Design a protein with these regions (language model features):
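Short C-terminal tail/terminal secondary-structure segment
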Residues: 2, 95-98, 238, 243, ...
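Conserved glycine-rich cofactor-binding loop
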Residues: 9, 16-17
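Conserved glycine-rich Rossmann-like NAD(P)H-binding loop of the short-chain dehydrogenase/reductase
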Residues: 30-46
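The beta1-alpha1 cofactor-binding region of Rossmann-like NAD(H)/NADP(H)-dependent oxidoreductases
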Residues: 62-73, 106, 232
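Catalytic loop of short-chain dehydrogenase/reductase
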Residues: 139-164, 169-178, 191
C-alpha cells in the first residue's frame, strides 16, 4: 500500500515550533515533499533539519503571507524544486491578540484580518496555476471558536477572521471544483501543543493552582478523555490533502475530542 501522500508536494504556511512543524513532518512521514513557509528563516531551517536531515523532501523560503509577491515566490519554489503543487495547508495565523468587542483595537483587527483571511487567500491564489495542473487540495486550519462561543479564552478578532475563512471555503470549493481542486477546513478545539501547554502553565501560576487542575478543566468538557494533539490535527490535514479525500470538498472537520459535536 502506498503512503498517504506518496509523491505529493504540499506547501505548508506558518511553520514554527507548533502545528506548522507537525504538519510539515506529517507530510514527509507520509511520503510527500513539504515546502515550508514562515516569516523567520531560522525557524524554517530548524524545522527542515529536524524533519528531513538530508534535505531530499523539504524546501523552505521566508514568507510573509500578507505580501502577495512572497506568496508567489513560495509557490514558485515548490514548482522549481519538486515540479508542482498538489496541496496547500494553511497554518499561518495571527493568534496572539486577546479580547472582545468592547476593548477592541480595530487597527489590530484589520491587521489580523489581513494575515488570517486575506493572507490565506493570497497564498491560495499564488498556488492556483500549479493546483489547476494537478488537481489537488487546499486545507485551511481554522478554529472551533469560529463556529461556537469559546469557554476559556476570548479572541474575538481571531475567531472572526477564521469564521470568515470558513465562509470563504464554500465559495472557493464551488469556484475551484471544476478544476478538481478541493477546499476543506480543519477546526481544532483545545490542542495539546506548545500554545496550550503555555496557557495551562500560565493559568496555573496566575491562579496558584496545580497545572493538573487547569488541564482537567479542559478535558472535563470532552467526550474523549484526552485532548487532541498537534499530531491529531496534522493527521486530519494530511488526510484532506490526500487523494483518499477525493470526493470531499467544502467541509469542516472538527478535531476536538468531542468537545463540540455537529
Amino acid at each position: 500500500m502506498s503512503l498517504l501522500l506518496q509523491g505529493k508536494t504540499v506547501i505548508v504556511s506558518g511553520v514554527g515550533a507548533g502545528l506548522g512543524h507537525q504538519v510539515a513532518a506529517t507530510v514527509v512521514r507520509d511520503g510527500g515533499n513539504a515546502v515550508l513557509g514562515a516569516r523567520t528563516e531560522a525557524n524554517l531551517a530548524k524545522s527542515a533539519a529536524e524533519i528531513d536531515p538530508d534535505g531530499t523532501h523539504t524546501a523552505y523560503l521566508p514568507t510573509d503571507i500578507s505580501d502577495e509577491r512572497q506568496c508567489e515566490a513560495l509557490a514558485a519554489l515548490a514548482q522549481e524544486r519538486f515540479g508542482g503543487v498538489d496541496a496547500v495547508v494553511h497554518v499561518a495565523a495571527w493568534d496572539s491578540y486577546f479580547g472582545g468587542l468592547e476593548d477592541a483595537d480595530f487597527g489590530t483587527w484589520q491587521q489580523i484580518l489581513d494575515v488570517n483571511l486575506l493572507g490565506t487567500l493570497r497564498m491560495t491564489r499564488a498556488a492556483l496555476p500549479a493546483l489547476k495542473r494537478s488537481g489537488g487540495s487546499v486545507v485551511i486550519i481554522g478554529t472551533q471558536s469560529a463556529i461556537a462561543s469559546p469557554n476559556e479564552v476570548q479572541q474575538a478578532a481571531y475567531a472572526a477572521s477564521k469564521g470568515a475563512l470558513t465562509s470563504a471555503m464554500y465559495s472557493m470549493a464551488r469556484e475551484l471544483g471544476p478544476h478538481r481542486i478541493r477546499v476543506n477546513t480543519v477546526l481544532p478545539g483545545w490542542m495539546w501543543g506548545p500554545p496550550v501547554q503555555a496557557f495551562v502553565t500560565f493559568t496555573a501560576h496566575t491562579e496558584g493552582v496545580p497545572e493538573a487542575e487547569v488541564h482537567a478543566r479542559l478535558t472535563d468538557r470532552m467526550a474523549l478523555p484526552d485532548l487532541a494533539t498537534d499530531g491529531d490535527v496534522a493527521d486530519a490535514a494530511a488526510f484532506l490533502a490526500s487523494d483518499r479525500a477525493r470526493a470531499i470538498t467544502g467541509q469542516s472537520l472538527l478535531v476536538n475530542a468531542g468537545e463540540l459535536m455537529r
